[in-house]
Structure formats: structure tokens, C-alpha cells
């Protein structure tokens, strides 16, 4: 049941620090009522998933669902999908905001330019995109595939947080 599922998510949050819990959601399955959708929206908001992969039900000829009564229109499926995607974006942003001002570790993956400046970017354990100003490193130094830690500063983009340059150290 949804109550059992939420309880499982609560247990994960109790025993693991800041876990990135994600889910997939199909909107507009045949027979889904406005009330069903409202319950789903309330549930996904209560659980506060870090990310939701939201997609519309897609009718496929020859499947049991193709013959089910209560097929929804594409516009209803699109609207419901849009509502959940917006909810997911809000929850994702709130999840990322929780690390601002806190020490975090990042596995550096690659170098990229963002708004005309050069950064080394990577992911935290929670899959939050982090940027480190490239000029923090000595010329010729390659931090790729190394772990660094520092204090999370501010949002560089909607989905990427920059580390405070004075706090960055390599993790041995």
C-alpha cells in the first residue's frame, strides 16, 4: 500500500543521511479518475521524492491496457504529467537547497564551461551536480576521477551548486 511505501521511505531517511529517493510515475492509465490523480499527487508530495521520472500512459495495440475502459485523452494525460513534473522540479530544488552551507563530497567527472567560466563538475553521493571553479587547481592538475570536499555555496544553475573555493580539499 502507499502507507507501507511511505513508511519504507521514512525508515530510509531515519537510517541514512539525506538519501536521494526517486521514483517513476505513469499518469493517465486507463480508468484513472481526477480523485485517483489527486491522491497520487498528494502521496508523491508527502514522500517528497528527490526526482520523479514522470511519463504519460502510452496506449499499445494488443495489450490488455489497450482494451481497458476509461481511456483518457492526450490533453488530460499531458496536463497531469505536467503537474507532476513541476512538483518533481520543486522537490528536487528543495532537496538540493538542503546541502547549501554544508560540507559535501564530490566525485569530479569532467571540465565544462558554465556562463563563460570554467569548472570541474561532478556528483555527490546523492547525485547532486556540484561545480568547482577550475582555477582552484594548479595548471596541469587534473582532478578528474578524484574526490574533493568543501562547503556547498550557492546555485550556479538551477541544477548545479558551486563549492566555496576557500573550503575545497582533496579527499585521500
Predicted regions, residues:
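Terminal RNA-binding accessory module
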Residues: 67-172
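Conserved non-cysteine loop/helix-boundary elements of the Radical SAM core domain that shape
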Residues: 1-51, 57-76
Amino acid at each position: 500500500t502507499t502507507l507501507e511505501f511511505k513508511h519504507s521511505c521514512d525508515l530510509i531517511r531515519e537510517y541514512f543521511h539525506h538519501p536521494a529517493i526517486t521514483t517513476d510515475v505513469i499518469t493517465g492509465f486507463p480508468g484513472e479518475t481526477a480523485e485517483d490523480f489527486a491522491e497520487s499527487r498528494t502521496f508523491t508530495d508527502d514522500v517528497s521524492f528527490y526526482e520523479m521520472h514522470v511519463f504519460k500512459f502510452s496506449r499499445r495495440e494488443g495489450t490488455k491496457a489497450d482494451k481497458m475502459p476509461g481511456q483518457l485523452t492526450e490533453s488530460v494525460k499531458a496536463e497531469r504529467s505536467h503537474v507532476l513534473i513541476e512538483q518533481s522540479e520543486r522537490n528536487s530544488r528543495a532537496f538540493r537547497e538542503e546541502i547549501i552551507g554544508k560540507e559535501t563530497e564530490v566525485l569530479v567527472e569532467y571540465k565544462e564551461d558554465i556562463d563563460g567560466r570554467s569548472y570541474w563538475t561532478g556528483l555527490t553521493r546523492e547525485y547532486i551536480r556540484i561545480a568547482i571553479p577550475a582555477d582552484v587547481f594548479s595548471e596541469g592538475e587534473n582532478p578528474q576521477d578524484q574526490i574533493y570536499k568543501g562547503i556547498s555555496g550557492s546555485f550556479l544553475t538551477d541544477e548545479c551548486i558551486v563549492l566555496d573555493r576557500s573550503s575545497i580539499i582533496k579527499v585521500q
